């Protein structure tokens, strides 16, 4: 294992009956990074987290933690803690008692417990809430207590299984920022599970996109969004226009009946490929100036932009623009070479 990896999954396979949940999955997780396992329901992300935590056992493969194989180590002996969507707080205990619970089990001195609990309350911005009943707290406050209870034990890794799922949108966005702040302040590894693309893009150092028990792509939020590895990733991470094309040469691609300059290279000449264009990368221009031309068939106001649908003879293009367009009007679309992303064509993802 490389020195900067804290966890390494090697060829993890897991099945329930005839259903393969994880298919020979391998993954390296670095020290001090915020890594997100992202994918739709049933993709295997939560099972991966549970195998790391020790709540599930892999059928085959190894879980390596700091150079030691931990497949047979029970959860309570692993140097990591888990926060679930259902926070599992003790309703008969107040905030202080919930956070102190694990420390009391370890029979730590009272003054040490008091110091550590106060440090956690400050970290999660709940100073002054020590004596509050759990049921008197909001969902966001309860979640902070759950995070403090997990972190007070000083784990080397914190596992978070869709912990924001029960919160409303405003609270969720606030907690995204809070979680990232806490992770950066503590400098420990966070492994976060979600199906929410915005959450993953907002918080992560590294995103692992999963589907059908396999890793589709792993990289920074910028790489995942701007350079999707395949059509599944392109469709799952934000909205995309995806069309068939032909790579004529390095930096030269043909699609939608015309030739465009692009920034991709390394494909075979005349190789069949797929072209990805993000809706926000289209520029709306006069009809006669357009690289692509069509008729506006739909305009939906989304708050920060209009979602505009433009149809030509063979394609329907979706673009996001702050300018309004009239339904039935003919407009042109312009593209920079950097906005045209090329993917290898796959028959089935």
UniProtKB/Swiss-Prot annotation:
The gene is potA. It is a peripheral membrane protein. Gene3D superfamilies: 2.40.50.100, Nucleic acid-binding proteins (2.40.50.140), P-loop containing nucleotide triphosphate hydrolases (3.40.50.300). Residues 7-237 form the ABC transporter domain. Coiled coil: none annotated. InterPro entries: AAA+_ATPase, ABC_SmlMolc_Importer, ABC_transporter-like_ATP-bd, ABC_transporter-like_CS, Mo/tungstate-bd_C_term_dom, NA-bd_OB-fold, P-loop_NTPase, PotA-like. It is found in: Cell membrane. It catalyses: ATP + H2O + polyamine-[polyamine-binding protein]Side 1 = ADP + phosphate + polyamineSide 2 + [polyamine-binding protein]Side 1. Part of the ABC transporter complex PotABCD involved in spermidine/putrescine import. Responsible for energy coupling to the transport system. It comes from Clostridium perfringens (strain 13 / Type A). Its EC number is 7.6.2.11. Belongs to the ABC transporter superfamily. Spermidine/putrescine importer (TC 3.A.1.11.1) family. ATP binds at residues 39-46. GO terms for molecular function: ABC-type putrescine transporter activity; ATP binding; ATP hydrolysis activity. This is Spermidine/putrescine import ATP-binding protein PotA. The complex is composed of two ATP-binding proteins (PotA), two transmembrane proteins (PotB and PotC) and a solute-binding protein (PotD). Signal peptide: none annotated. The lineage of its organism: Bacteria, Bacillati, Bacillota, Clostridia, Eubacteriales. Keywords: ATP-binding, Cell membrane, Membrane, Nucleotide-binding, Translocase, Transport. The keyword Translocase applies. Pfam families: ABC_tran (PF00005), TOBE_2 (PF08402). GO terms for cellular component: ATP-binding cassette (ABC) transporter complex. CDD domains: ABC_PotA_N. NCBIfam families: MMSYN1_0197, potA.
């Amino acid at each position: 294992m490389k020195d900067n990896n804290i966890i390494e999954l090697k060829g993890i396979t897991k099945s329930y009956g005839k259903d393969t949940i994880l298919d020979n999955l391998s993954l390296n997780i670095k020290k001090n990074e915020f890594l997100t396992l992202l994918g739709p329901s049933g993709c295997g992300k939560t099972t991966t987290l549970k195998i790391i935590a020790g709540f599930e056992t892999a059928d085959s493969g190894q879980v390596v933690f700091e150079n030691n194989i931990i497949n047979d180590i029970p959860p309570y002996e692993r140097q990591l803690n888990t926060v679930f969507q259902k926070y599992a707080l003790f309703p008969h205990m107040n905030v202080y008692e919930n956070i102190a619970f694990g420390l009391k089990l370890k029979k730590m001195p009272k003054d040490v417990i008091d110091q550590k609990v106060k440090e956690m309350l400050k970290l999660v911005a709940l100073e002054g809430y020590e004596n509050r009943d759990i049921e008197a707290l909001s969902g966001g406050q309860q979640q902070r207590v759950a995070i403090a209870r997990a972190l007070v034990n000083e784990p080397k890794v914190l596992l978070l299984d869709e912990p924001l799922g029960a919160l409303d949108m405003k609270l969720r966005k606030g907690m995204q920022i809070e979680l990232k702040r806490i992770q950066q302040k503590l400098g420990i590894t966070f492994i976060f599970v979600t199906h929410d693309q915005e959450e993953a893009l907002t918080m992560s150092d590294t995103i692992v996109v999963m589907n059908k028990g396999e890793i589709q792509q792993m990289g920074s939020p910028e790489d995942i969004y701007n350079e999707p590895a395949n059509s599944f990733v392109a469709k799952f991470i934000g909205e995309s226009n995806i069309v068939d094309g032909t790579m004529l040469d390095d930096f030269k691609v043909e699609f939608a009946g015309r030739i465009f300059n692009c920034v991709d290279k390394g494909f075979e000449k005349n190789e069949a490929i797929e072209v990805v264009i993000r809706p926000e990368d289209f520029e709306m221009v006069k009809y006669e100036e357009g690289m692509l031309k069509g008729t506006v068939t739909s305009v939906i106001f989304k708050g920060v932009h209009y979602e505009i649908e433009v149809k030509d003879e063979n394609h329907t293009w979706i673009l996001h623009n702050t300018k309004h367009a009239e339904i039935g009007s003919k407009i042109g679309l312009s593209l920079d070479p950097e906005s045209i992303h090329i993917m290898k064509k796959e028959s089935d993802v």
